[in-house]
Amino acid sequence: MLRLRNCGIEIINCADTKPGAVLYFFCAEKVDITPAADMAVAMIYPYEWNSMMTPWKSAGNNGTGDGDVFAEEMVKNIIPVIEEQLGFEQGIRGVGGYSLGGLEALYMSTRYRIFDFVGSVSGSMWYENALEYFENNRMNVKHAFISLGKREAKTNNPMRKSVLENTVKIVEKTKEYADTVFLMENGGHFTDIRGRIERCKLDFNSFCK
């Protein structure tokens, strides 16, 4: 694993040749992803998850709100390091993430025009002001993949109960300007994390063909 000052990086690439596409994916814990032909996956493991994966501060939640700083670091420093290592010069880029990582990925796609694909896997669309933000800020992508567990809204936490309603509204908004896949998965937030990420990867792979 490549370790930078603010995140660990694991690159999954099945070929010695230069990949034609790269998917950058944010995750809190290490997940073993299957290599896929003609593409690479760069698993990004931020050291300060709650801080780096939240684009703005949430009232009452200390240690949040550095996602914009991390996004800039990704674009200016982290992505160039990875692409130099891969020999990736031109092709398709995607950004995705799990949980708060999904929130950060969608946010990055609104701030920068370097991604063709965005993926949110069990994304934290319950986060304060997330719905309002994505209803008013367009994602600069051609294709979006958004998934959520069927039981994720079944919680006693009043804020997190909104995750399904908010996600559906964001999906409908995204469909207005990008090809969008919305997948309801079995289980709750922590069910089959690897499988859910794999399905996002497969959708990215299909988009690239």
Regions found by a protein language model. Give the residues of each.
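Gly/Ala-rich beta-loop-alpha elbow adjacent to hydrolase catalytic centers
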Residues: G96-G101, A105
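The feature captures the conserved acid-bearing segment of alpha/beta-hydrolase catalytic domains
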Residues: M125-N205
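A conserved short beta-strand
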Residues: I114-W126
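Short, hydrophobic alpha-helix immediately C-terminal to the catalytic nucleophile
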Residues: L4, L106-T110
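Serine-hydrolase catalytic machinery in alpha/beta-hydrolase-like enzymes
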Residues: G8-E10, T17-G87
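The conserved beta1-alpha1 loop
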Residues: Y24-A28, S122, L148
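Short beta-strand immediately N-terminal to the catalytic nucleophile in serine-hydrolase-like folds
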Residues: G94-G97, V121
